[in-house]
Structure formats: structure tokens, C-alpha cells
Curated annotation (Swiss-Prot):
The keyword Cell cycle applies. The gene is engB. GTP binds at residues 32-39, 59-63, 81-84, 148-151, 185-188. It holds the Pfam family MMR_HSR1. It comes from Burkholderia mallei (strain ATCC 23344). One of its GO terms (biological process) is division septum assembly. Necessary for normal cell division and for the maintenance of normal septation. This is Probable GTP-binding protein EngB.
């Protein structure tokens, strides 16, 4: 099966909101703690080994990386790799810069159509993960959480983590959050959850095509 994300390439890097590209294509943000396996997940989703780079020193990446997907001449969308957060040894000034960059981007970027939140299945919904959700909540746009590294849990532990996370996310909906909050298990190593993640992201950036696919299946 061909996936849109398999047609991905590096587009640009920015370190300030003023440098965000004046593109019109929909954007999907990828967020997560520095050790949540975000870069690895992006590479597996895009079927590439070195598209997104993980810093050898967690927390050192301070910029936003853009990857275009679809035909090179006419990109369909952009994947936006946000700086990893939560690493204790990062200087305070850098943390403040990240927080301003992340919160402003998530709250004000009109092209942004949804956020993929990467969380280690063994430690989901940390305080900083919740902060990301709360920054994004006012937009009413969807958040889909990937519980990464689920291969490190037993089957029952994975099920328990999934249920507990969904219950916690439901509390945001009950509190009035308008956007969809969904979650799934994901393992880059075992390739668990790849098809589901592909389908969801493509439904965000190409909703008309997704509707056609569902109609074809129904027939």
C-alpha cells in the first residue's frame, strides 16, 4: 500500500516565529518529550532512516523542522517536527525560548490542522505532556497521541496504559475541549500501529480523499 507520508523530504528549519514559511498547505505538528522516540517515529512513518535526526544530547534541538509530503513539485502538506521538551539539563533561557516558540506556534498557526503527541507508553501524560494539550486546546483542532515504545510492555500492560490514557483524555473533553482527543499504541521497532497512524494523518491533510476511501469501502 502506498502512503502519502512515504513521499517526504526535508523542507526548512526555523528558530523563530517570524521565520515560519509562508506556505498554504496543511501542517501536522509532532510533539513529545526528548526521550519519547519522536524522531524515530517520524522516520518509520515516512519509511526513511535519516529524515528526522535525534540529537545525541537530548534536549539540544531548539528549532522547528519542516518536512514536505507529496509530490516534490506540488507538496500536499507539511510535517512539523517540534523541539523535544522536558530534558532537565537544558538551560533556563533555552527552556523559556522553547515554551514561547511551541505555545505561540500551536496557538496561532492557521495552517496547523492537528497535533501528534508522542508519549512513552510507560510514562504517558506527564505534566509537560498535559501542558502541550492545554496550549493546543483553545484551537479546537484534533490531538492524536501515540503511546510509543509499547513493545517494552506486556500485552496487558499495553492495554492498561491505553485505557488509562484514554480515560485521562476524556476528562479534557468533559471539561469542554472541542477538538478530538484520540490515542493508540505505537512501536517503531515492531511497526505496531503504523497503518492506523498513516490513515489518521492522511485524513487530516486530505479529508476529501479520506471520505472517498471510506465511501469506496462502504460500497
Amino acid at each position: 500500500m502506498a502512503f502519502l507520508l512515504h513521499q517526504a523530504r526535508f523542507f526548512t528549519t526555523v528558530n523563530h516565529l517570524r521565520d515560519l514559511p509562508p506556505t498554504v498547505q496543511p501542517e501536522v505538528a509532532f510533539a513529545g518529550r526528548s526521550n519519547a522516540g519522536k524522531s524515530t517515529a517520524i522516520n518509520v512513518l515516512c519509511n526513511q532512516k535519516r529524515l528526522a535526526f535525534a540529537s545525541k544530547t537530548p534536549g539540544r534541538t531548539q528549532h522547528i523542522n519542516y518536512f514536505s509530503v507529496g509530490p516534490a513539485a506540488e507538496p500536499v502538506a507539511h510535517l512539523v517536527d517540534l523541539p523535544g521538551y522536558g530534558y532537565a539539563e537544558v538551560p533556563g533561557a533555552a527552556k523559556a525560548h522553547w515554551e514561547q516558540l511551541l505555545s505561540s506556534y500551536l496557538q496561532t498557526r492557521p495552517q496547523l490542522c492537528g497535533m501528534i503527541l508522542m508519549m512513552d507508553a510507560r510514562r504517558p501524560l506527564t505534566e509537560l505532556d498535559r501542558r502541550m494539550i492545554e496550549w493546543f486546546a483553545p484551537t479546537g483542532k484534533p490531538i492524536h497521541s501515540l503511546l510509543t515504545k509499547c513493545d517494552k510492555l506486556t500485552r496487558q500492560e499495553s492495554i492498561n496504559a491505553l485505557r488509562a490514557t484514554q480515560k485521562s483524555l476524556d476528562a479534557y473533553r468533559d471539561a469542554g475541549y472541542a477538538g478530538k482527543l484520540t490515542v493508540q499504541l505505537f512501536s517503531a521497532l515492531k511497526r505496531t500501529g503504523l497503518d492506523d497512524a498513516h490513515a489518521l494523518i492522511e485524513s487530516w491533510v486530505r479529508p476529501a480523499a479520506a471520505d472517498e476511501d471510506r465511501a469506496a469501502v462502504a460500497e
